[in-house]
């Protein structure tokens, strides 16, 4: 309920750093349906808040990833027109992610979202560094291992795409074995790296 989530966020905010407090406040906008009743308006408010935080903390990889995610959840695979021109805030979001990548920071969220943002562009090679770097960040997660194939396919590196997908299935099976009999959590996406 609204009261419970508000009370929980108050507890965490008392123990949080100033940046963490701002993230909690942004998450409250996004996750608490009672904060703003209209889902589209709530998504726009969350994007606005993450845009502000990204401007304030441009070197923070978590903020960059959350900003990208807030934008991408609104645009939903509609980042480029048929001529390859960016739509909406695509350029700003790409610059935010690429700023973190250029600093040499290894961050699975930044790499993952960069791949998704750039894959349908006319320059998918812009995300090759993300594709080449993502797997090593969380190699036990099949979806993370699979993701580079989105770029490898677009740039004609077909064998690398095949190899990543084979490894992603092995990672899924390894995780499934480690997980045991407990049901996997429903994270609102495909199971593991698309299927076991």
Language-model features and meaning:
Residues 1-8, 12:
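Single conserved hydrophobic/aromatic residue that forms the stacking wall/gate
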Residues 13-14, 50, 57, 97, ...:
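Alpha-helical junction/boundary sensor with strong preference for TPR arrays
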Residues 16-35, 59-80, 104-118, 140-142, ...:
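Amphipathic alpha-helical repeat scaffolds of TPR domains
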Residues 35-51:
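Asp-box/WD-like beta-propeller blade repeats and closely related beta-sheet repeat scaffolds
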Residues 174-190:
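Acidic, Ser/Thr-rich low-complexity linear motifs
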């Amino acid at each position: 309920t609204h009261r419970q989530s508000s009370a929980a966020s108050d507890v965490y905010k008392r123990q949080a750093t100033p940046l963490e407090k701002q993230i909690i406040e942004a998450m409250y906008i996004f996750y608490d349906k009672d904060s703003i009743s209209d889902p589209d308006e709530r998504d726009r408010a969350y994007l606005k808040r993450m845009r502000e935080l990204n401007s304030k903390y441009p070197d923070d990889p978590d903020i960059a990833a959350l900003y990208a995610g807030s934008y991408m959840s609104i645009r939903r695979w509609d980042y480029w027109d048929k001529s390859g021109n960016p739509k909406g805030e695509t350029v700003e979001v790409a610059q935010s992610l690429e700023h973190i990548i250029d600093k040499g920071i290894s961050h699975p969220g930044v790499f993952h979202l960069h791949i998704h943002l750039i894959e349908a562009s006319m320059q998918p090679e812009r995300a090759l560094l993300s594709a080449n770097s993502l797997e090593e960040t969380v190699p036990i997660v099949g979806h993370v291992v699979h993701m580079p194939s989105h770029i490898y396919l677009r740039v004609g590196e077909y064998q690398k795409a095949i190899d990543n997908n084979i490894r992603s299935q092995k990672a899924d099976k390894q995780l499934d074995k480690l997980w045991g009999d407990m049901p996997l959590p429903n994270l609102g996406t495909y199971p593991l790296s698309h299927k076991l």
